[in-house]
Amino acid sequence: MPRSVWKGPFVDGYLLKKAEKSHEGGRKQAIKTWSRRSTIMPQFVGLTFQVHNGNKFVPVLVTEDMVGHKLGEFSPSRTYYGHAADKKAKRR
């Protein structure tokens, strides 16, 4: 179920402030964040975020296609090892 339209997208306030500072200063330094739940805004395009995945920080370069998605979508928190092979079939 999507978020109500009247509420608008959720973004942590400090992320907006850091993005504005980064644009004003012209710095290309990555913005470190634990806020995987924040929505990517148009102001974030071209910036690099380091999004925490529970273990380490994953660098995410924001492009126009990512606007409207969440930061956590681009920083996988689980490792997929594939399905276990059938031991009986393997032995034959």
Curated annotation (Swiss-Prot):
Family classification: Belongs to the universal ribosomal protein uS19 family.
BP GO annotations: ribosomal small subunit assembly; translation
InterPro entries, A to Z: Ribosomal_uS19 (IPR002222), Ribosomal_uS19_bac-type (IPR005732), Ribosomal_uS19_CS (IPR020934), Ribosomal_uS19_SF (IPR023575)
Sample GO molecular function, one term: structural constituent of ribosome
Organism in which the protein naturally occurs: Maricaulis maris (strain MCS10)
Keyword terms of this UniProt record: Ribonucleoprotein, Ribosomal protein, RNA-binding, rRNA-binding
Coiled-coil portions: none
Record's protein name: Small ribosomal subunit protein uS19
GN (gene name): rpsS
